[in-house]
């Protein structure tokens, strides 16, 4: 099986699924044994540079040399450093690289011939509609498509003996708001309007038309407008916008054809173009082209709106479910269930295992991924839950079953720190609902909130441990008797489980301190604490009650277990010449006595043992 990598950056919050659809359609039409791996981010959407760093890190995940061909959709990468970095990696990977709608020396260009349709539009405007004053309403100055369209515009001006001073070029973005701003600036400047705005795309054209109407102008009565791309907002706008049709799915299909020719050793042109067509409409003074079915369009929009509402409701429901979760495992279960309701064939979550620990000092990678710590947290495929022992096992599964399928890899990160990534198989819903960023960001924000909450809980637990620990001996202190032992006693008492209360006091400790010094006395206390804790049965506690007094507590107690505990402790300490007195009291399951009452009885038992030992020594003397 051959593997193709598609490196892409979303357009704002949207993902261009048409490339993927065209690629997979062509692979299946030809019945080729090929899999598509898409690595997509949204590095141009956030204003937070560190967040964008975390997005672009997904490009560091693949071993590019392991692919048979690579397709770069880099026209939306606005970070110059990131753009140069990925281009350099691709130039050095030793694999044939195709670039979509962006010419890069050494790569094969696949896309539209941006110059030819602009020449055709300019000729039409000049010869058919008599335009003599032009403005090119452009997109980003450094965007390749915009650059090519500007170049063709300039060629035509030169051909007609016109200058840029009289026929200027405007630079902005590719969005609707750019067109609105262009029109406002013209109105506010008081400049004479041109005969035509030649726009870099349909978004800009629609913005100009709409804003012109706000100021009392009408297109095409007062001036003409043309667009590019043949988006719905061109075909169904009022006025219908003259535009250029380019089929993005055909670009995807052409990518497959070019790679097949390369793999077969056949000659391939450096630039590979899809057919494009100028579509003339009302905005340039031509009649409605009649190529649209308004009722069918409205029907599709209504159905799409209903479906979008359903998808949004599912996302809102997921958000509410995740907010009620107590841990990451539960969150991942809900997310996987959510994706099973969408039109996709599978999803896998690969995350750094440090996510689950949520230690307060945890750091995640900024460059690349901590592969030795990556685990498959959860996933499904074809409505069946899947589990993998390692990421390597998942990767082998993807390769073994990947033929004629598309895998989408998107980053999971907390700002610049990379936690892992999500793998989605055949996300067909993205064609009708391209706002995948909304889904992805909701999931990531929930994971980050859970992580920070766990960090706070862990930090609070550490502080509580310090608060409940005796600094000298390291065992629980008297506060822990109230905070830990007392609640434990109440729990076992309610369940009818007998417990043992043990009261311990060091014999003649004042004399030890006076004779050998306080440092020696401290070591005696430390040793008593160690032995008490080491011999304490499971689920039990030992605490320093004060001075040379200690308390032991353990459940599921019997007289034999209690006697065994005291015998072992005293035997070990006696061998080290450390003498203690111990009193034990067993609780009565279901009784009404308080723990303090039982402790008082244990204290009395300890005191009796201490007195007996003193009497015994007197008799010996």
What is the predicted role of each segment?
Residues 518, 563-570, 574, 585-621:
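Catalytic-core segments of nucleotide cyclases and related cyclic-nucleotide turnover enzymes
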Residues 412-422, 433:
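Short hydrophobic/glycine-rich mini-motifs in sensory/regulatory modules
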Residues 428-448, 457-462:
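Amphipathic alpha-helical "output/dimerization" segments
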Residues 317-321, 457-478, 484:
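Amphipathic HAMP/coiled-coil signal-transducing linker helices
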Residues 1-49, 53-317, 325:
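Bacterial carbohydrate/catabolite-sensing allosteric modules
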Residues 477-500, 507-534, 543-547, 551-552, ...:
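Conserved long alpha-helical elements within nucleotide-processing catalytic cores of c-di-GMP signaling
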Residues 397-400, 404-413:
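A short, aliphatic-rich beta-strand micro-motif
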Residues 321-364, 538:
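Helix-loop-beta substructure at the N-terminus of cytosolic sensory domains
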């Amino acid at each position: 099986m051959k593997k193709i990598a598609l490196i892409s950056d979303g357009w704002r919050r949207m993902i261009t699924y048409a490339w993927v659809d065209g690629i997979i359609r062509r692979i299946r039409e030809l019945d080729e044994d090929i899999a598509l791996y898409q690595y997509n981010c949204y590095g141009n959407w956030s204003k937070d540079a560190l967040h964008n760093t975390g997005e672009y890190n997904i490009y560091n995940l693949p071993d590019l040399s392991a692919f048979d061909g690579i397709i770069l959709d880099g026209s939306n990468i606005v970070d110059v450093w990131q753009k140069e970095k990925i281009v350099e990696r691709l130039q050095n990977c030793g694999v044939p690289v195709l670039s979509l709608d962006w010419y890069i020396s050494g790569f094969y260009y696949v896309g539209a011939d941006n110059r030819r349709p602009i020449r055709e539009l300019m000729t039409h405007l000049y010869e058919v509609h008599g335009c003599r004053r032009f403005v090119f309403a452009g997109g980003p100055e450094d965007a390749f498509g915009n650059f090519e369209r500007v170049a063709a515009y300039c060629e035509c001006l030169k051909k007609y003996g016109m200058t840029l001073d009289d026929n200027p070029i405007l630079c902005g973005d590719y969005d609707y708001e750019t067109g609105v701003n262009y029109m406002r600036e013209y109105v506010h400047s008081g400049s004479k309007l041109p005969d035509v705005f030649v726009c870099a795309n349909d978004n800009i054209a629609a913005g100009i038309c709409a804003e012109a109407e706000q100021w009392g102008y009408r297109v095409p009565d007062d001036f003409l407008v043309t667009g590019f791309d043949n988006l719905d907002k061109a075909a169904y706008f009022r006025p219908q916008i003259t535009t250029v049709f380019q089929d993005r799915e055909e670009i995807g299909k052409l990518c497959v054809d070019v790679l097949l020719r390369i793999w077969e050793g056949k000659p391939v042109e450096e630039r590979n173009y899809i057919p494009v067509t100028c579509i003339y409409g009302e905005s340039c003074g031509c009649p409605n082209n009649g190529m649209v079915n308004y009722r069918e369009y409205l029907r599709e929009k209504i159905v799409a709106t209903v479906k979008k509402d359903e998808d949004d409701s599912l996302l809102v429901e997921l958000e509410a479910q995740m907010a009620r979760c107590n841990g990451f495992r539960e969150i991942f279960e809900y997310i996987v269930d959510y994706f099973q309701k969408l039109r996709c064939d599978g999803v896998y979550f690969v995350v750094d295992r440090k996510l689950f620990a949520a230690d307060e000092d945890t750091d995640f990678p900024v460059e690349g991924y901590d592969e030795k710590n990556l685990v498959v947290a959860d996933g499904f495929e074809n409505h069946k839950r899947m589990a993998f022992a390692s990421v390597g096992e998942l990767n082998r599964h993807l390769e073994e079953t990947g033929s004629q399928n598309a895998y989408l890899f998107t980053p999971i990160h907390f700002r610049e720190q990379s936690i892992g990534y999500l793998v989605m198989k055949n996300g067909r819903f993205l064609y009708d609902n391209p706002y995948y960023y909304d889904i992805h960001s909701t999931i990531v924000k929930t994971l980050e909130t859970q992580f920070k909450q766990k960090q706070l809980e862990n930090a609070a637990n550490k502080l509580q441990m310090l608060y409940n620990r005796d600094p000298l001996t390291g065992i629980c202190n008297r506060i822990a008797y109230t905070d830990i032992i007392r609640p434990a006693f109440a729990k076992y008492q309610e369940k009818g489980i007998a417990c043992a209360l043990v009261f311990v006091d060091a014999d003649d400790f004042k004399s030890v301190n006076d004779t050998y010094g306080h440092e020696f006395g401290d070591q005696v206390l430390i040793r008593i604490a160690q032995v008490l804790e080491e011999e304490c049965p499971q689920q039990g506690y030992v605490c320093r009650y004060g001075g040379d007094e200690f308390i032991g507590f353990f459940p599921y107690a019997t007289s034999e277990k209690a006697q065994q505990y005291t015998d072992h402790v005293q035997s070990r300490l006696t061998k080290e010449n450390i003498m203690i007195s111990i009193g034990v009291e067993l609780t009565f399951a279901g009784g009404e006595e308080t723990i303090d009452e039982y402790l008082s009885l244990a204290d009395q038992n300890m005191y009796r043992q201490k007195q007996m030992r003193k009497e015994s020594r007197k008799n010996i003397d």
